[in-house]
């Protein structure tokens, strides 16, 4: 089975700026995307967004932290880009 490759948008995704709990949860999400692909219906508040984007919550409370990723693979290439991880207020959706 071919795993998915995960890329990072360096401008918008900076894991070191996340709180420790959110960063740890983000690591789990990335591992799951690499193993099983971008559709993660088992994650809290997961939803598929327009333009092949997906999002879920990685830390509840105030502030809430979310992750946004995009399936950018073409012609059966399994490629996902993490485009954002941060507070809900600044999420690109």
Segment roles from a protein language model:
Residues 1-3, 51, 77:
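Sequence-level motif detector for i,i+2 pairs with an aromatic at +2
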Residues 31-61:
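A short, surface-exposed loop/turn module that caps and links secondary-structure elements
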